[in-house]
C-alpha cells in the first residue's frame, strides 16, 4: 500500500526525522491560506499523487509570493498529471501539499528497501539527489552506495559510516546522517515497509538533513498489524479495476499493451508476459487467478480485462495443479454468457483435467477460441492475431 508525501512526512516527524513545515490543501483558497499560516517568502506547491516524477510533469512548483501560490495551485489542482510512473493516462490531482522553503546547500538520494535476491535490507544512497536514480546508477555508479543489512543484526554504525563515506560527508555531518538513517531503518522495520525513499534528502546551510520528499510503501499482508497505517489508504489513487480484482481474490495489474493475460501462478504469469514481449507483442496486464479459481472468479477476470479497450487478444495460460483446467474452461463459458467477446482468445491448458477442459471448449459454440499446444506456440498465435 502506498501513501501520500504529506502522510509519510507526518510519520517521519512523529519519529524524530526532520521535515520542513507543510500543510495539505484541497482547494486554491486553502493553499493560499496554508502559505500565509506557514509564513516565510518561498513555498513549494506540490501535487499529491501516488507516483514519482511529479516535478518533470509540472506537478511541483516553487512560489515566491502568495500570488504565485494561488496561480500554481489553480493550475495544478484538478490537472491530469502525467509522469513516467503514471502511464499515458496520468492521475487526477485532488490535493496539494504547501511546504515552506529551505536554504538548500546539497541534495542527496536515500532509500531503504528489501533485496530479495540477497535476503537483506539494502540502503541505497547517492550524492546525486533530486535525479532519476536509475540514470545515476548507469552513468555514475561510483556515486551510489549500496549497503546490505542482515535483518537479524540490524542497522549498525559501520553501515552508516559506509554511506557517509560515499556521500563525502565530514565527521559532524556523518554523525547527523547516521542518526537519521538509524531512525529511518527502525521505522522501516517497525511499520513493515516494502520501500522507503527520500529524493531529495537535503542538507541545509546549518548542516542539518531534511526529508524534502518522502515515499513509503507498506506490505499489504502486514496491514492488520498497523491499523493506523491502513487508515491512510487513498482508494482514489488506486486503479479501480485492480481494486475490484483484489476483492475477488485476483492479482491484477494494468499495463499498456494489447494482449490480455489470464494465468494461474505469479511465476507462470511473469513467464507468459516475458514470452509475449519476446514474440514482439505487448501484455496489457498481469493477472493471476490463483490456485482456488472458480468459474465465477474466471468470469470476473474476463469482465475486468475486457473493459480495457486496448485489448486485441486474450491469452489464457493455465497449468492445472491446484486449479483444475475444467474449472477454467467452465469459467470461460460462464464469462461469455454475460460478456460479449468479439476478440480472439488463445488458450493453453495443461495439467489436471486438461482433456476434460478441451472437451468442454470443443463442445461449446465459441468460434473465436484458438488452442495452443505449448507456451511458445501460444505466443506465436497471439503475435499473429495482434498483427
Swiss-Prot record:
GO terms for biological process: succinyl-CoA metabolic process; tricarboxylic acid cycle. Mg(2+) binds at residues 199, 213. Its cofactor is Mg(2+). Pathway: Carbohydrate metabolism; tricarboxylic acid cycle; succinate from succinyl-CoA (ligase route): step 1/1. The keyword Ligase applies. SUPFAM superfamilies: Glutathione synthetase ATP-binding domain-like (SSF56059), Succinyl-CoA synthetase domains (SSF52210). It catalyses: succinate + ATP + CoA = succinyl-CoA + ADP + phosphate; GTP + succinate + CoA = succinyl-CoA + GDP + phosphate. Binds 1 Mg(2+) ion per subunit. Substrate binds at residues 264, 321-323. ATP binds at residues 46, 53-55, 99, 102, 107. GO terms for cellular component: cytosol; succinate-CoA ligase complex. It comes from the Bacteria. It is an enzyme of class 6 (ligase). The keyword Magnesium applies. GO terms for molecular function: ATP binding; magnesium ion binding; succinate-CoA ligase (ADP-forming) activity; succinate-CoA ligase (GDP-forming) activity. Belongs to the succinate/malate CoA ligase beta subunit family. Heterotetramer of two alpha and two beta subunits. This is Succinate--CoA ligase [ADP-forming] subunit beta. It comes from Campylobacter jejuni subsp. doylei (strain ATCC BAA-1458 / RM4099 / 269.97).
Amino acid at each position: 500500500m502506498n501513501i501520500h508525501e504529506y502522510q509519510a512526512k507526518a510519520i517521519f516527524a512523529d519519529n524524530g526525522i526532520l521535515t520542513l513545515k507543510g500543510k495539505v490543501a484541497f482547494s486554491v483558497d486553502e493553499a493560499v491560506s496554508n502559505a500565509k499560516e506557514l509564513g516565510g517568502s518561498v513555498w513549494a506547491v506540490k501535487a499529491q499523487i501516488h507516483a514519482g516524477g511529479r516535478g518533470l510533469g509540472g506537478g511541483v512548483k516553487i512560489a515566491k509570493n502568495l500570488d504565485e501560490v494561488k496561480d500554481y495551485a489553480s493550475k495544478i489542482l484538478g490537472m491530469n498529471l502525467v509522469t513516467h510512473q503514471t502511464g499515458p493516462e496520468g492521475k487526477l490531482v485532488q490535493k496539494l501539499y504547501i511546504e515552506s522553503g529551505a536554504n538548500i546547500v546539497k541534495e542527496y538520494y536515500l532509500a531503504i528497501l528489501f533485496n530479495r535476491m540477497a535476503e537483506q535490507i539494502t540502503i541505497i544512497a547517492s550524492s546525486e539527489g533530486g535525479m532519476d536514480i536509475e540514470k545515476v546508477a548507469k552513468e555514475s555508479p561510483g556515486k551510489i552506495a549500496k549497503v546490505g543489512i542482515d535483518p537479524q543484526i540490524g542497522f549498525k554504525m559501520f553501515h552508516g559510516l559506509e554511506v557517509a563515506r560515499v556521500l563525502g560527508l565530514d565527521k559532524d555531518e556523518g554523525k547527523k546522517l547516521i542518526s537519521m538513517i538509524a531512525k529511518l531503518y527502525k521505522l522501516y522495520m517497525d511499520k513493515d515497509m516494502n520501500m522507503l525513499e527520500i529524493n531529495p534528502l537535503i542538507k541545509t546551510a546549518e548542516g542539518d538533513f531534511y526529508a524534502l520528499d518522502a515515499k513509503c510503501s507498506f506490505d499489504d499482508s502486514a496491514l492488520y498489524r498497523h491499523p493506523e497505517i491502513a487508515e491512510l489508504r487513498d482508494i482514489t489513487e488506486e486503479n479501480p479495476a485492480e481494486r475490484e480484482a483484489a476483492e475477488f481474490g485476483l492479482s491484477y495489474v494494468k499495463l499498456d499493451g494489447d494482449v490480455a493475460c489470464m494465468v494461474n501462478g505469479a511465476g507462470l504469469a511473469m513467464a507468459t508476459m516475458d514470452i509475449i514481449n519476446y514474440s514482439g507483442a505487448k501484455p496489457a496486464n498481469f493477472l493471476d487467478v490463483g490456485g482456488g479459481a472458480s468459474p465465477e472468479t474466471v468470469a470476473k477476470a474476463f469482465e475486468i480485462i475486457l473493459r480495457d479497450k486496448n485489448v486485441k487478444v486474450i491469452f489464457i495460460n493455465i497449468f492445472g495443479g491446484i486449479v483444475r483446467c475444467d474449472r477454467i474452461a467452465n469459467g470461460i463459458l460462464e464469462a461469455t454468457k454475460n460478456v460479449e467477446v468479439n476478440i480472439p482468445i488463445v488458450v493453453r491448458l495443461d495439467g489436471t483435467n486438461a482433456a476434460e477442459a478441451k472437451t468442454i471448449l470443443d463442445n461449446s459454440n465459441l468460434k473465436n477460441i484458438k488452442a495452443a499446444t505449448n507456451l511458445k506456440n501460444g505466443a506465436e498465435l497471439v503475435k499473429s492475431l495482434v498483427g
